[in-house]
């Protein structure tokens, strides 16, 4: 049984490395933020008596799609652009900012005071991603 568990773990690690480029600090941060966002969203729904399995499933589906987009970024970097981690890092940074802001919004829904510095850092990260998206849009218009 131990051999089966070890083999399964090795296969899953290989798939994860191929799909997402291995577990680094960025990916750990994204996964942590996604879990925290889901949990805080559920807590808000419980407190407001709006808990719904349909909405919960939609939240999980969004998280799966975020991971699919990270995989797209990694595969583009590795197999199309010839190395590096530009696309993967940009995708992860974008979703770290979104998930972080969502966590703050969930906390705000429960009237929890929010640290101004944390708000500023996440907004700065988000605005940096928005600026890069605008630059890309203008480049493609040319």
List the predicted regions and their residue ranges.
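Transmembrane helix interruption/hinge and helix-loop junction motifs
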Residues: 20-26
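Hydrophobic alpha-helical transmembrane segments in multi-pass integral membrane proteins
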Residues: 69-78, 130-133
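Juxtamembrane helix-capping/reentrant segments at transmembrane boundaries
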Residues: 48-69
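Short, strongly hydrophobic alpha-helical membrane anchors
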Residues: 1-19
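Hydrophobic alpha-helical transmembrane segments and immediately flanking/interface helices
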Residues: 79-109
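Membrane-proximal cytosolic segments adjacent to transmembrane helices
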Residues: 2-4, 97-142
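Alpha-helical transmembrane segments of multi-pass membrane proteins
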Residues: 17, 30-41, 66-74, 94-102
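A cytosolic-side transmembrane-helix exit/cap motif
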Residues: 46-55, 106-114
